[in-house]
């Protein structure tokens, strides 16, 4: 077959394979067009799950008669005109493919009228060449798009449609997501002539909470923490549920970037990391989060459906979201009674995002002026706060004001006792020593179950036999056997690393600011040299009871730094060794699943240990006696 140009209808049908997956995809594209047109009310009528009819009616600015013929043409749009527009997208649509693709696989009719026109006009495309026909019609200011008999000319696609109930459920979910993104817009959803969803315009915070409650449920609102978190040109707002309100499936996770609903791995990973040890792998967080940033810093031209985006500074976005959500969850653990009074002006000094300035050229839009630019400005104004629940709104400064962190109280010693009890029975003397070890595990120097003399280990090698339940190494030396707890080995590695004369440091992308109370400030004055010796770098402002963390030891980069610092300042440490012990006891440890990783950890610790300090490693060993099983 020679090379030839595809007919317009076939080319549009190929494009429709990416854009129009099911009736819900049509609803998404058409509603986004209505939003770009500046509509304040949108009505969505569905028949037979969208297979028979999808009708979207809005009160936007409408389309002029002379533009109607191009409205159904491929790659025709009024929202961008050059590469600069594409790199700073604020409108939801910009590709100019949706209407052409939908009309190629359905019977599409578009009726519209602008305020300047005395009458409305209707356009539809038909035939192999997708020729358009325009005729007068009766219609108020705004636009109505009717999509009838979806996939009527592509039977292979139509047979993949699910039941009417399933397809409408997908449409309902799309409308819910858009309604959360645009609370100021009123939405009405009908199915087979019956009104099923009606969301009124929400401007005030109480009205927005009602919409969130209608979509996510009252239980979510009662267990939600409100976030308003800023840093330079980044702004994170919305709600995250407390860890106890976890979900068995990922059905209450809504994230938006510049008002666009997206599914992004960076955002999801950051939120998941913020929850950390609060949730198991089978539990999912619930959240509704809005991220606003300079449109030049995000690429939305990744996929025709525009569900995916790429951040130019993905690591910065990840850390910003992780820190904002993490601080909100930690604040939830604090005593809310201490924050009933409104935040004072001096508590809020983070600069507001300013990228919506006149320096940024707005997108060209079918509606003319892009209404979402000014709307975003309004959203960004306000203080950085966290709030809990709908009945009572508590304010939290982003200055980490006296945050009381929540840490897991899992006892390593209990885990070890269970491990050793299930694996084998040790002699009475060893059991007694293990009990002593459980009581004194907060100090590395006292982690001794069966005391070992360094001379007994010198000149002989310990052979690694197995990894026991991913929690301990089973070692052999001649006829003697030992268990080496990996949790204690990791803590020893952290302590030895922080004792090195030249500690590798890493600057924070987003410095962490702490607002201290009197007791914490007094402890800071006593312990700041300990922080400096351990590789931390702060800027301090004692007059305002504030310190700012700028650099951290590289080995602690992935740790809960704000929680560690506050916890350390809640305690009194007279010596650097006590300080390091307390710090290392708070760190999140890695799970080790293979023997090779355990041996790597052991090798790293041995390299950090000086010859005269080998006793520190020997003190972690727990003697195991197999004699009674051989008799």
From Swiss-Prot:
PROSITE patterns given in the database record: DNA_MISMATCH_REPAIR_1
What GO molecular function annotation could you give as one example from this UniProt entry?
ATP hydrolysis activity
Q: Does the keyword DNA damage apply?
A: yes
- State a single Pfam family of this protein: HATPase_c_3
Entry keyword set: DNA damage, DNA repair
Has the keyword DNA damage been applied to this entry? yes
Disulphide bridges in this chain?
none
Q: Which GO terms describe its cellular component?
A: mismatch repair complex
Record-given protein name: DNA mismatch repair protein MutL
Q: Which organism is it from?
A: Mannheimia succiniciproducens (strain KCTC 0769BP / MBEL55E)
Phylogenetic classification of the source organism: Bacteria, Pseudomonadati, Pseudomonadota, Gammaproteobacteria, Pasteurellales
Q: Which gene encodes it?
A: mutL
